[in-house]
Amino acid sequence: MLDRGYTVVATDYLGMGIETVDGKQAGLGSYLVGDTAARSVLDSVRAAQQLEAAQAGDDVVLWRHSQGGQAVLFAAQEASSYAPELKIAAVAAAAPAADLTKLMGSHLDDISGVTIGSYAFPAFAKVYADVPGVALSSILTPAAIEKTPEMNSLCLLSSLTELHEIGQPLVGNFTLHDPTAVEPWATLLSDNSTGAKPFEAPLFVAQGSADELVLPADTAAFVSHEESIGVDVHAVTVDGASHGTIAYEALPELEQHVPINGGS
């Protein structure tokens, strides 16, 4: 993409990766918080435009995976109001965390749910601190509350083994209640799920058939919803691709259907 004249920008999400202070993450979290993540994505483009050598223009292709997929979908929804100077040419998401209710509901009693929850619940509790009943003690067990700061300090990609070692004893003892069924968590999960409003840019969605985190059926339901509200969607399923490999294995299809070759 660099050879084709594109400026490539990776988003530094608000609050994520910040050193902990007294065992607690400094700053507001943004993990799976749709509006915050969307603004981080759009602000990253604006930041690149401030670098003269980058020669970054206003035409933007948004492309991310998993949590990042949710972020670019929200960015596409919010771009016209938050960053109207940017022209979103296309949106692409691989195995996006599009429906948080389904994502959390599918993994309440496994290590994936513990891992995702260790990032998401503390982030929600900080961002929505003024919402009645949003304290971590309303949804997480004391054992989970004790371990989440340690898990928060680790990177999901580079420290997955360590994360799972910490989280495995919490499987079955992580939440006090089903967060998809009790308030205010059910509403927060719904509000941070994508698809509340359409956007004009074409959408490319890639899903791995062997993905055990973002389930193929959930992505198919998301695609159907986007189509029903008027979004131009091209969806592909890559046979045998897992959650960890789909972003790479979908690149050939991405190049065909997203304007990164100077095409339309």
What do these predicted regions represent?
Residues 186-187, 213-216, 220-264:
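C-terminal catalytic histidine-bearing segment of alpha/beta-hydrolase fold enzymes
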